[in-house]
Amino acid sequence: MSIGKIIQVIGAVIDVEFQYNDIPNLYHALEVNIDNGNSHQVLILEVVQQLGRSIVRCIAMGSTNGLKRGLDVTNLKHGIQVPVGKETLGRVMDVLGNPIDMKGPINSIEKWSIHRSAPLYEELSSNQELLITGIKVIDLMCPFIKGGKIGLFGGAGVGKTVNIMELIRNIAIEHAGYSVFVGVGERIREGNDFYHEMIHSGILDKVALVYGQMNEPPGNRLRVALTGLTIAEKFRDEGHDVLLFIDNIYRYTLAGTEVSALLGRVPSAVGYQSTLSEEMGMLQERIASTKSGSITSVQAIYVPADDLTDPSPTTTFAHLDATIVLSRQIAALGIYPAVDPLDSYSKQLDPCIVGQEHYDIANNVKSILQRYQELKDIIAILGMDELSEEDKLIVLRSRKIQRFLSQPFFVAEVFTGFSGSYVSLEDTIAGFKEIIDGKYDHLPEQSFYMVGSVKEAIEKSKIL
């Protein structure tokens, strides 16, 4: 057994000295027993640097309270390993795979290391099958494919977590798929609400939850995304189509910044770590679909100060197949989900993938909304009367389209007072086509607000 001694503690970074011929490898896990009189704690460290002179620098995967120089450290001779397989479904784990839901141990047959290689090029799948979410604005304007990577961009409080909760609910119930949810540096309250929402929806047994909340050390928040991804990779390799939800990628970046500063690395632009692109690439390249199964990833990405040019969101952009931008201006109008259809984009919005009709209707919706944006200044200064008849019609239809893009969510029923709605792709396309064609020009625009299909809008108009 390889034993070392702690020689320095700087916050979450610990230096350990070993015998010169027994130095741990990078990413090896080390174990420290901390005895504080009444309590006993086992702390796991991960080797991230070899400093020379038989000293390794580690990051702590837990609180360093009670650590002191001279404590013995055991080299476990392997990386951090977490339980994988169906035994993880319905359970809440921390970064080390330990259960934190007070339901007893996870009796998993297998444990996998959280540091793994991305699949080889010949193993990758090029399948282009659409994944229907039941959310109109997403299915029409920025469709997903199985095995795609989707980014939910938005500032504070515009609905990233609620959108993720609705996606998990819809896909678990309508598609009967497995999901892995990773909470990276988010609020404990949100994690608790999310857990109880999964119980309320009856889909907890189809979701594995991995939490590294914002009160935890940076090491936990940096590695928890890899823990969740490892669990998802196991499901994929067993032939399942699995969904991986990460909330929030920005906190993953921020944890990397904290660790980088503690390790003494020179910072890059805006204070981010100089290895930002590499760390992001190592995570994103593992989120891949193979010929065995698929991992479809939905990642919430906080945008600092609503600035999309910040290095953190821009580094993430390069890896995504679809970007869904949540707008504060649209949220201010009371339209939820607050997706901006003009800023959002999907590589899958292609006639070869979605079909010509879907492609044409999505483009028509975009052009009508874009024209409405251009006319807003004229309306504000001169009023509607100065517009041509054609422009008046565009404004009328665009306001209906804008409201029809809203939708009541199942997970938000208690807040909105509207019953949740899942809308098929066929109903979505048909509804927008009929609005564009002017079939519902006689209906009040308010009848299209917070409804599912266009049939619900017709029924609503009868009571307005």
Swiss-Prot record:
Its EC number is 7.1.2.2. It is a peripheral membrane protein. It catalyses: ATP + H2O + 4 H(+)(in) = ADP + phosphate + 5 H(+)(out). SMART domains: AAA. Produces ATP from ADP in the presence of a proton gradient across the membrane. The catalytic sites are hosted primarily by the beta subunits. Belongs to the ATPase alpha/beta chains family. This is ATP synthase subunit beta. It comes from Blochmanniella floridana.
